């Protein structure tokens, strides 16, 4: 299969390209980007000004193409429109953007894609467990106050999509509170969140705290990730899953829970 990893020279895009190459997927030498660059490590970088004129030749040379998007929140919707317009199946690893418009676009087009706020399979499994708990025990945390703090590398522009998803599950269990504190200052990340200095440029530390009204009971859920490799491997799994669905003639929108189920 041919894979176009979009978002180079970004670090996440580089890790995904390496993860896909490791599985012997054909990573083509082109990438959509917002950077004002023409080339990076042998990859030709396409931006809004030239991608429309280049894509036909790319699709002719590299048929059965799947795009993997790790660009920027501001590019999510425009890139998705580009993929749908050119009938390019895609895995959307970029968070942010207008998610309602994104989902409406791909559902109306019945476009084959995987869209998820988190590509780490283990964290997705945790998310699924909390969604199940919320559905089956909707009053489990009635009266509890929820506080959330998340730390990511300083260049992550948006609030964590995973944090938003878990907040919804806790709210569905009766907890109150929807403020997510973003920590992007490196001194605070080290002192407040205990992020190792060597992982300041790539980490995801989340803490969800629930307290009873009289503060006599405290629950805390935490997941800390150092580095980006876990997301690269999960993304490669999503690519393989999507390719399998396409080969079977199945279109539509999938998430990482579907990937986990196979």
Annotated model-derived regions:
Residues 32-33, 95-97, 118-120, 151-153:
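Short, ordered loop/turn segments at secondary-structure junctions
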Residues 56, 60, 77, 81-85, ...:
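Amphipathic, non-transmembrane alpha-helical secondary structure
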Residues 58-78, 88-89:
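Rossmann-like NAD(P)-binding element
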Residues 2-58, 142-262:
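C-terminal substrate-binding/catalytic lobe of Rossmann-fold NAD(P)-dependent oxidoreductases
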Residues 74-81, 93-115, 121-132:
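Rossmann-fold NAD(P)-binding glycine/threonine-rich loop
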Residues 21, 84, 107:
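Anion (oxyanion) recognition and catalysis
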Residues 125-140, 158-159:
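Rossmann-like NAD(P)H-binding beta-loop-alpha module
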């Amino acid at each position: 299969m041919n894979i176009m990893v979009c978002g180079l020279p970004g670090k996440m895009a580089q890790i995904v390209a390496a993860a896909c190459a490791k599985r012997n997927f054909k990573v083509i030498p082109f990438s959509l980007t917002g950077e004002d660059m023409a080339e990076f490590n042998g990859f030709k970088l396409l931006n809004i000004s030239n991608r429309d004129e280049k894509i036909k030749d790319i699709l002719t040379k590299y048929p059965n193409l799947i795009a993997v998007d790790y660009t920027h929140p501001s590019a999510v919707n425009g890139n998705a429109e580009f993929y749908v317009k050119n009938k390019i199946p895609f895995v959307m690893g970029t968070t942010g953007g207008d998610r309602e418009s994104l989902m409406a676009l791909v559902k109306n087009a019945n476009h084959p894609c995987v869209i998820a706020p988190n590509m780490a399979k283990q964290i997705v499994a945790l998310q699924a467990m909390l969604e199940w708990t919320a559905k089956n025990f909707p009053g489990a945390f009635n009266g509890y106050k929820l506080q959330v703090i998340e730390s990511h590398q300083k260049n992550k522009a948006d609030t964590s999509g995973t944090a938003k998803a878990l907040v919804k599950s806790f709210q569905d269990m009766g907890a109150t509170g929807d403020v997510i504190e973003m920590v992007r200052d490196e001194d605070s990340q080290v002192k407040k969140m205990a992020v190792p200095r060597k992982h300041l440029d790539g980490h995801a530390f989340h803490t969800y705290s629930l307290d009873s009204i009289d503060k006599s009971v405290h629950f805390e859920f935490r997941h800390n990730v150092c580095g980006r490799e876990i997301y690269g491997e999960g993304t490669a799994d999503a690519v393989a899953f999507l390719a399998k669905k396409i080969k079977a003639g199945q279109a539509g929108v999938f998430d990482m829970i579907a990937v986990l189920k196979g």
